[in-house]
Regions:
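Active-site clefts of carbohydrate-active enzymes
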Residues: 1-37, 53-57
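Conserved, mostly hydrophobic/aromatic
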Residues: 50
Length: 105
């Protein structure tokens, strides 16, 4: 997964130190990463599905926040991230058809 540097709580940026994953600049970049990741999964033609594991951002055991969710700690949606998730998720069946056709050629 990816975490964005622009995530914050009451004006203070998240530490984003919990867990693995990549760090990107913005929520839009998180969406681009998500789309690219999903496209590569579909292109392999052996993926049975995927899930975004975290609903909301959270804290680690030291009280430091990490940007893992589709909504903030205050349950505000990351609209630019979600719109890109929605775009690829709505197109998944046509993308599967595309990659299936491409592999036959």
């Amino acid at each position: 997964y990816t975490k964005a540097e622009d995530a914050s709580y009451q004006g203070t940026g998240y530490a984003n130190t919990e867990g693995g994953g990549w760090l990107v600049h913005t929520q839009k970049n998180r969406g681009e990463f998500y789309q690219n990741f999903c496209l590569r999964l579909l292109e392999t033609r052996n993926c049975v599905g995927w899930v975004h594991f975290e609903y909301n951002d959270g804290y680690d055991s030291n009280g430091k926040a990490s940007n893992k969710g589709v909504v903030s700690i205050e349950y505000e949606p990351y609209t630019s991230f979600l719109s890109q998730m929605r775009q690829v998720n709505l197109a998944v069946h046509s993308l599967i058809d595309y990659y299936d056709t491409k592999s036959v050629q």
